[in-house]
Structures are given as C-alpha cells and as structure tokens.
Amino acid sequence: MGEAVTANEGLSAALSATVDSEAREFIRLQLRAFNDLHSEYHRAIRSVEPTPLDILIRNAAGEIVGGLIASTYWGWLEVNILWVAEGLRRLGHGRTLLRMAEAEARTRGCAHVMLTTYSFQARGFYEKKGYRVVGEMAGYPPGVVYYWMRKDL
C-alpha cells in the first residue's frame, strides 16, 4: 500500500489505504466542474440545495413510530428511507407515507420518484404502489439483491 507505480509519460499512480482529505476534495471538485460544464441540471443544483421532504408518524406519547426521509430536486422525489415500526407494519402506514410524499412532490413540480431497496426489504410493497425496477445488482451484499426503482407521477 502506498507504493508508487510508474506509468507512461512520467506519471505515477499510488494506492493508499489511508484517507487524503485534500486529494479527495480536489478530485470531487474536478468531477463537479466536468459535470457542471456538461449538464445544466448539475449547475442548477449547485445554486439551490435539494428541498427536504420528511414525514413523521408519532404515537400518542410523541415517539416516532414511522417516517419517510426524502428530498426533491431536478423534478424528482428521491425517497432515501421509509420505515414503520414492526408492530405497525401492514396496516397502511407505509402507503400513507408514500402517498403524502408523492402528493407533496407533485405540488413541488416533480414528475418522477426514485428509491432503492434490498431484496430483504420492500420490493413487493413498492411494486404494488406502482414502482418498477429499473436496475438491480445481485450480490450486494453477498446473497442479497439491491434494486433501483422508479415511478412516474
């Protein structure tokens, strides 16, 4: 680890198992500049942060027993997390969270929703709500399938 490998034209590549924060930030900014040059949407998102869209379900004691964490940008709703407490599952709370998020996304001008789920999570639930698989990666982690899903609003 960390040993330089000589390449053509006087360049070298070095592998490291330690974080070089300055180098990582430089590389991130270089890719951002490239993206901004080629995509008006990437440029636009830099001027406005994605708008959070969070919905919480609380019990009578005020404890969180379910929720959806998402954001809207580029005309999309991105659902990052949807969770309902074990004893409250299969009672329609997940459906309510999705419906509320989709309705708010429409008011924000969104036309699509995207989310990810694992094979041990909720693919069937999302499919029943009109979502479809647009990509999958088997073996991530081993023995599991990771799905990308979308829905047009």
Predicted regions and their residues:
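Active-site rim helix/loop that mediates acceptor-substrate recognition in acyltransferases
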Residues: 28-61
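Conserved acetyl-CoA-binding loop-helix of GNAT-fold acetyltransferases
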Residues: 90-103, 128
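Conserved N-terminal entry element of GNAT/NAT acetyltransferase domains
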Residues: 1-21
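Conserved catalytic-core motifs of GNAT/GCN5-like acyltransferases
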Residues: 114-116, 132-150
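Conserved GNAT acetyl-CoA-binding A-motif
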Residues: 105-119
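A conserved beta-strand-loop-helix scaffold within acyl/acetyltransferase catalytic domains
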Residues: 46, 59-60, 65-76
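Conserved active-site tyrosine of GNAT-family acetyltransferases
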Residues: 27, 126, 131
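A conserved beta-turn-beta hairpin within the catalytic core of GNAT-like acetyltransferases
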Residues: 71-80, 89, 141-145
